């Protein structure tokens, strides 16, 4: 199955969500599924080529190494290139529409 795992987002528990999403993605891949791990807030920003490439992309190391402190959400917002006020990043809805299942690894 093609599964999109949504993690991160804009929550004080963002880092925990990224870590959960990484673990869920790896477990699903071990079971033979095609998995695209996507940060809900940043979406497909920075993805080279079509968003479908995320199904073959390794789990980012940054998703596995989380800090103990809550993230500075103002810094997270400022880091998004398109500066959109939306909580949903570019390409997320389109990627989800093409998946068989969307798994929410969101917290908070």
Give the positions of each predicted feature.
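ATP-binding N-terminal substructure of ATP-dependent carboxylate-amine bond-forming enzymes
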Residues: 1-108
């Amino acid at each position: 199955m093609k599964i999109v795992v949504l993690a991160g987002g804009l929550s004080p528990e963002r880092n925990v969500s990224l870590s959960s999403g990484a673990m869920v993605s790896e477990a699903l891949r071990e079971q033979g599924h095609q998995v695209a791990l996507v940060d809900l807030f940043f979406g497909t920003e920075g993805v080279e080529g079509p968003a479908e490439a995320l199904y073959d992309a390794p789990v980012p190391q940054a998703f596995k190494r989380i800090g103990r402190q809550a993230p500075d959400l103002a810094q997270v917002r400022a880091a998004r290139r398109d500066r959109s006020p939306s909580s949903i990043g570019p390409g997320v809805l389109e990627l989800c529409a093409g998946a068989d299942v969307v798994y929410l690894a969101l917290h908070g």
